Design a protein with these regions (language model features):
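Active-site-proximal alpha-helix that buttresses catalytic centers in soluble enzyme cores
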Residues: 2-204
């Protein structure tokens, strides 16, 4: 009997409306991988941040339609991947770390569907404790609860096929832009305390 396998694309998530911004921020700062403080102190600091930042964040979201575009693009990626019949995965879906559908909801649904193996694909090409570490930790916790085997594809941006494809698109864009075009590489930073704790994100 073959094992039913599913692939889950996992992203941070985002608010689908301005009403969801405060709960979204609260969920982020409740994560010890994001805000590594003792539980009570983390809750206190989280509430302070959310109270102070919600309105300014709402104003910025209103400039882009009042919701996160990440939701639309993640769903589009899943639909495109489903077009190609996978010889390995019977089902391809998505989950978010901080908004619905959450990893918890997705694992429960997969368990109900009889899936015994779940491969997690974080939608970040790098590895970082705060992002991919949080996702992998939560996935392992839920896999244990539902008796599902789980795997995580980590730091996939280092694969030579991905780099070659990115180079191809970049060269095409540079050729189209013409002489004088410049490429700006932008990356998230992480607190130095995380680097000292062994997070190798800067090396990526």
């Amino acid at each position: 009997m073959s094992v039913k396998q599913a692939l889950v694309l996992v992203n941070m998530g985002g608010p689908a409306s301005t009403e969801e911004i405060a709960p979204y921020m609260r969920a982020i700062f409740a994560d010890p991988f994001i805000l590594p403080l003792p539980w009570l102190l983390r809750g206190f600091v989280s509430n302070k941040i959310v109270k102070k930042r919600t309105q300014p964040v709402i104003e910025k979201y209103n400039l882009i339609g009042g919701k996160s575009p990440l939701l639309k693009w993640t769903e589009k990626q899943v639909k495109l991947m489903r077009r190609n019949d996978s010889p390995l995965f019977e089902h391809i879906t998505h989950a978010y770390r901080y908004t619905s559908p959450t990893l918890d909801q997705t694992f429960a649904s997969l368990k109900k569907g009889g899936y015994q193996s779940v491969t997690i694909l974080p939608m970040f090409p790098h590895s970082s404790r705060a992002m991919t570490g949080s996702i992998e930790h939560e996935a392992k916790r839920l896999a244990k609860r539902h008796s599902i085997t789980t795997y995580t594809i980590d730091a996939w941006g280092l694969h030579k096929e991905i780099i070659a494809l990115q180079s191809e698109y970049l060269k095409s864009a540079m050729d189209e832009a013409g002489t004088g075009a410049r490429v700006l590489f932008v990356a998230h930073g992480i607190p130095m305390r995380e680097v000292k704790r062994g997070d190798n994100y800067p090396d990526k």
